[in-house]
Amino acid sequence: YVSHWANKKDLLTPNNPQFDLATGDQTSGGSHSWNSQFGVFGRINYNYKEKYLLEANLRYDGTSKFPTDLKWRWFPSFSAGWRVTEEPWMEGAKEVLSSLKVRGSWGSIGDQSVSNSLYIPTMSLTNSTWIHNDAKDVYYSTPAAVASDITWQEIQTLGFGIDAQLFNKIGITFDWFERKTKNMIVGAEGLGIGFGTTAPNGNYGDLSTRGWELALDYGHV
């Protein structure tokens, strides 16, 4: 990604916005950044008589945003379903319980939504008048502290659900889920006041959420 910009102040007339018709200071700047991602995945499905359903997935993802030995990671996921009403011993209940399916799943996926150089010490260039009031001097900031072993954040999701239909009219769907974010990229804690700079970001955090959903629908033909 490449960007360039330029600015000139004190435009003589807003009806003709050209650089030649501005008399103030002219400034310009730009930036250049890049990143790359690559991933492959495979999937296996199994269906036995529309009764037992299985699925397995496996991803292999890489990104340039992390150190060479930490940029690649495997992410698996699995799901299974059982259509209970397809069992022979459920035939007598189908007048009331038209359909019943029990399902479950677990999976993980990577998150690399961070800046490109989070693990690289960088120095920023700045113009300032804090040394000489009448002139802008160029100075570089000291490199920030970084975590050299930073890697993927991993999101794991566990879920169970039931889909049911009564009298071919009333639909019931229930879902329970747990979502865990492991190795969250956050600022380090517990550093003394004499550390001397901003705390580095690294895979120091974890987050867990749970919830459930219930949905009802009615269809009359």
Where are these regions (language model features)?
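Extracellular/periplasmic, surface-exposed regions of secreted and cell-surface proteins
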Residues: 1-221
